[in-house]
């Protein structure tokens, strides 16, 4: 199921809802994708180090249980929270992250951003800049508990990027961030979110089908 949350969504409330959903689910619980746009907030993951918060100013900082370092969420960015049963899909965490990245790349290609790419050793999606620099356009951070995943990814659409200057994004000093608008792609948060959710649902559904076929002894 794909659903939009009320906007702007309070980060703490959504995080609590994800934890409650994950704690209550069982083997038969349907997977869900939650789409939202957050009010301005910095989030610091489990590996987050306070020295990467350079100048948060008046923007709230939330320490959360996802993987990764520090990032920023705000208006003009779409969040896709993927509440997936990884055991049902037969996915290890690294395979799951790979699936999220591939779905994001497919979404960006749909939107006309063909040059988006991955960066070895640095989760997320990047866009080459003049001079060869890679600027980050999508960030990933996941949590897996008892085989159930939550949190997900953030894709920059058309936003005020200046709050990223108050941090070392994802723990990388000097890492540049961009959005679709800066790359010459004009679209809405709603359209980008729907395309992203469709790609995520398709990729995860395919993994679930392959796992079911393997368990049944049917060639994939």
UniProtKB/Swiss-Prot annotation:
Cross-referenced InterPro entries: aa-tRNA-synth_II/BPL/LPL, BPL_LPL_catalytic, Octanoyltransferase, Octanoyltransferase_CS
Residue ranges occupied by any BPL/LPL catalytic domain in the UniProt entry: 27-208
Residue(s) at site: Lowers pKa of active site Cys: 136
Family, similarity comment: Belongs to the LipB family.
SUPFAM superfamilies: Class II aaRS and biotin synthetases
Major site of localization recorded for this protein: cytoplasm
Gene3D superfamilies: Bira Bifunctional Protein, Domain 2
Protein name: Octanoyltransferase
């Amino acid at each position: 199921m794909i659903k939009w949350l009320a906007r702007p969504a309070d980060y703490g409330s959504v995080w609590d809802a994800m934890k409650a959903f994950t704690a209550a689910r069982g083997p038969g619980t349907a997977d869900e994708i939650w789409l939202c746009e957050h009010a301005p907030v910095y989030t610091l993951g489990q590996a987050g180090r306070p020295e990467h918060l350079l100048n948060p100013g008046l923007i709230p900082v939330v320490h959360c249980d996802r993987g990764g370092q520090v990032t920023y969420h705000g208006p003009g960015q779409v969040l896709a929270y993927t509440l997936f049963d990884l055991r049902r899909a037969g996915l290890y965490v690294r395979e799951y992250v790979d699936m999220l990245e591939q779905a994001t790349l497919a979404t960006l290609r749909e939107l006309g951003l063909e040059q988006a790419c991955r960066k070895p050793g640095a989760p997320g999606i990047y866009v080459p800049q003049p001079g060869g620099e890679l600027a980050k356009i999508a960030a990933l951070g996941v949590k897996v508990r008892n085989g159930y995943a939550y949190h997900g990814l953030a894709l920059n659409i058309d936003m005020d990027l200046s709050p990223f200057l108050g941090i070392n994004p994802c723990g990388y000093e000097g890492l540049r961030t961009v959005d679709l608008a800066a790359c010459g792609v004009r679209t809405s948060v709603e359209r980008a979110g729907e395309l992203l959710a469709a790609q995520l649902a398709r990729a995860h559904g395919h993994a679930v089908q392959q796992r079911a076929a393997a368990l049944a002894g049917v060639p994939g």
